[in-house]
Regions:
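Long terminal segments
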Residues: 1-22, 57, 63-133
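Amphipathic alpha-helical packing elements
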Residues: 51-52, 59
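Short "repeat-start/strand-capping" segments in structured domains, especially the N-termini
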Residues: 9-12, 28-33, 46-50, 63-67
Length: 133
């Protein structure tokens, strides 16, 4: 069943793709934690909407199944559930998932920045640099 505030089905692993269609990371079936395919924890989903680093920095937000960058309002990643936004390339095959590594402790969230206006284009950070903000 799809949660009203979260566009993804419960208990499903959701792959996120970059602007070239390459699978970069996934949302674990717990619906909260994002992992790279090598098992590295990347960030978590806060209030079913915001992507937050474990250091407490707001990185982006979910919008119609895609992730929007807090830096400039551009589209960073998409899923099979994405709608709207810039044109999406064909999705490439997903790599196998390695065992998940332990997650770091979540630090207190920083103040949430104001959202920039959405831009209907791909972010230059549609890659792992998004998580190194």
């Amino acid at each position: 069943m799809i949660n009203v505030s979260n566009p993804f089905p419960d208990n499903e692993i959701i792959s996120f793709y970059d602007c070239t269609g390459m699978p970069i990371f996934y949302l674990h079936s717990d619906g909260e934690n994002f992992y790279h395919y090598d098992g590295t924890p990347l960030a978590y989903l806060y209030n079913n909407e915001f992507i937050v680093s474990y250091s407490g920095q707001y990185l982006g937000w979910l919008y119609n199944g895609s992730i929007i960058d807090y830096k400039n309002g551009t589209y960073v990643f998409f899923t099979v559930y994405s709608s709207g936004g810039p044109s999406r390339p064909s999705r490439k095959a997903r790599p196998s998932r390695a065992s998940r590594k332990s997650r770091p402790s979540k630090l207190s969230c920083n103040s949430r920045p104001s959202r920039p206006s959405r831009q209907i284009r791909w972010s230059e950070r549609s890659n792992m640099s998004f998580f190194r903000s």
